[in-house]
Amino acid sequence: MSEFLPFSRPAMGVEELAAVKEVLESGWITTGPKNHALEQAFCQLTGNQHAIAVSSATAGMHITLMALEIGKGDEVITPSLTWVSTLNMISLQGATPVMVDVDRDTLMVTPEAIESAITPRTKAIIPVHYAGAPADINAIRAIGERYGIAVIEDAAHAVGTYYKGRHIGAKGTAIFSFHAIKNITCAEGGLIVTDNENIARQLRMLKFHGLGVDAYDRQTWGRAPQAEVLTPGYKYNLTDINAAIALTQLAKLEHLNTRRREIAQQYQQALAALPFQPLSLPAWPHVHAWHLFIIRVDEQRCGISRDALMEALKERGIGTGLHFRAAHTQKYYRERFPSLSLPNTEWNSERICSLPLFPDMTTADADRVITALQQLAGQ
């Protein structure tokens, strides 16, 4: 059998090794100048005013909710079709996640679903830019402004995603991920951008023990001796080892995403003749980052279930992913919200399958996936 083709593989090279070597030889391996450079680079990429690097996007979500003073008695609107960490962070703050349905074919929340879920207790809205495509963020942000509700963009899939000519995170508050499967990675890491100076100040304190300064003060080359804890905080800072890798990856972003786009186009052309349904593209002007390529496997239409397809591909040496099992079907949330029904979310959660997609894939790799899908579709 051919070598196993994973669902994802990070695109690392000699440049990343050199970046890590430089940090190790510098003598400063934790939060330092590489973090500052990464934050500046993301301000330049997005056009936003402030950037705060953190140890993960989950950590970023946690302290963003804290900075917005979201807690007991508050409600936060979010899709159920998202990684469960968002729901977990809302719940750990003592707030209530209000899960709404998604569009059946883009798998993103709609402004209409969000607005219908607003109550006097709604404190925040968390739309997800899903799979590398942008949600209709102008319309969602307008709802937030109309009701006085904060919008936190889950941009974990959206490094390199553009909406109506502007990079995701150009204004407001957005959270990016550098997890191992993301479009740029440093193994683990995340970053928040915001145009709110007060939120930025709170985030910098909360990510590092509640201190009023960073781990690395860029003026005095070391933390000032008079630094004080201004509020209880966490240990969510990003090391310079990770930041250096992320910076190197960011310099390659256009190349990495171009290759993702080429593979996605190869899949799209082949799937036109197959019963497996890819996601629809958003109607608004955008640039897709192609973080994921997802098909829906409906047994009645395809002659095979999603789970059986994934197992059959595995037997052929091809890895797949599931993004995501609906959060409200997980045990904890199923028991907490037993009557919640989200038809589009549930239909997709039972059928979605993420195909291999990463920059180092070859055309032959994609052809191998396509051939397997053709065989499993009986063609």
Curated annotation (Swiss-Prot):
InterPro entries: ArnB_NH2Trfase, DegT/StrS_aminotransferase, PyrdxlP-dep_Trfase, PyrdxlP-dep_Trfase_major, PyrdxlP-dep_Trfase_small
GO cellular component: membrane
Cofactor: pyridoxal 5'-phosphate
E.C. no: 2.6.1.87
EC top class, as a word: transferase
Pathway: Nucleotide-sugar biosynthesis; UDP-4-deoxy-4-formamido-beta-L-arabinose biosynthesis; UDP-4-deoxy-4-formamido-beta-L-arabinose from UDP-alpha-D-glucuronate: step 2/3; Bacterial outer membrane biogenesis; lipopolysaccharide biosynthesis
One GO process term, biological-process aspect: lipopolysaccharide biosynthetic process
GO-annotated molecular function: pyridoxal phosphate binding; UDP-4-amino-4-deoxy-L-arabinose aminotransferase
Modified residues (N6-(pyridoxal phosphate)lysine): K182
Domain of life: Bacteria
Family: Belongs to the DegT/DnrJ/EryC1 family. ArnB subfamily.
Function: Catalyzes the conversion of UDP-4-keto-arabinose (UDP-Ara4O) to UDP-4-amino-4-deoxy-L-arabinose (UDP-L-Ara4N). The modified arabinose is attached to lipid A and is required for resistance to polymyxin and cationic antimicrobial peptides.
Quaternary structure and interacting proteins, as annotated: Homodimer.
Protein name: UDP-4-amino-4-deoxy-L-arabinose--oxoglutarate aminotransferase
Organism: Escherichia coli O157:H7
Gene: arnB
